[in-house]
């Protein structure tokens, strides 16, 4: 018995998965550099913990971002978000003040929220009938990023 499902486009699936890897690797930089930031800025445990909270707060907008993703071309979000997150996270070491750290992490958080809402939608489009396989590659990219970061 043959399967009538379309084969999917493995190249595009791998491209979206690679984008997930590239996006999430700099996102994982906060934990290793946090002790350095604590020393540099004399942060309390509360202030240090708040930095990660600030980075995650934009995820509360995910339902709204999903509505936006349903109405506009999402390709640009997937292209721009990894670079924006990498730049914001890379500048943490150059931040002159705690407030700048907060702003950089907020930018990284918004970029992350936009990416993580739109990339699975793109994966569904490029997987063409093999959504499970596509999403498994997508998730692999994210897990490898946490390992590398």
Range-by-range predicted roles:
Residues 10-48, 52-53:
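Helix-loop boundary and gating motifs at the non-cytosolic
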Residues 104-142:
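Cytoplasmic helix-loop-helix junction between adjacent transmembrane helices
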Residues 55-57, 143-144:
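Short hydrophobic/small-residue motifs within alpha-helical transmembrane segments
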Residues 88, 99-107:
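Paired small-residue
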Residues 17, 49, 79, 132, ...:
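Conserved glycine-rich helix-kink/hinge and helix-boundary motifs of the Major Facilitator Superfamily
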Residues 24, 28, 109-117, 147:
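Small-residue-rich segments within alpha-helical transmembrane domains of MFS-like 12-TM solute carriers
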Residues 60-96:
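Conserved MFS/SLC helix-loop-helix module at the cytosolic interface between two early adjacent transmembrane helices
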Residues 42, 73, 94-99, 128:
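Helix-breaking motifs and short loop linkers at transmembrane-helix boundaries and internal kinks
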């Amino acid at each position: 018995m043959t399967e009538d499902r379309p084969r999917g486009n493995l190249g595009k699936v791998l491209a979206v998965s690679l984008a997930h890897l590239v996006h999430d690797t700099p996102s994982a930089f906060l934990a290793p550099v946090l002790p350095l930031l604590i020393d540099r800025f004399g942060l309390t445990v509360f202030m240090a913990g708040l930095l990660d909270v600030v980075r995650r707060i934009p995820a509360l907008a995910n339902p709204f971002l999903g509505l936006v993703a349903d109405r506009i071309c999402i390709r640009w979000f997937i292209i721009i978000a990894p670079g924006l997150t990498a730049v914001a996270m890379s500048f943490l070491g150059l931040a002159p003040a705690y407030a700048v750290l907060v702003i950089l992490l907020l930018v990284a958080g918004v970029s992350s929220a936009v990416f993580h809402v739109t990339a699975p939608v793109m994966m569904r489009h490029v997987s063409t009938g093999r959504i499970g396989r596509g999403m498994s590659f997508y998730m692999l990219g994210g897990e490898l990023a946490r390992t590398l970061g």
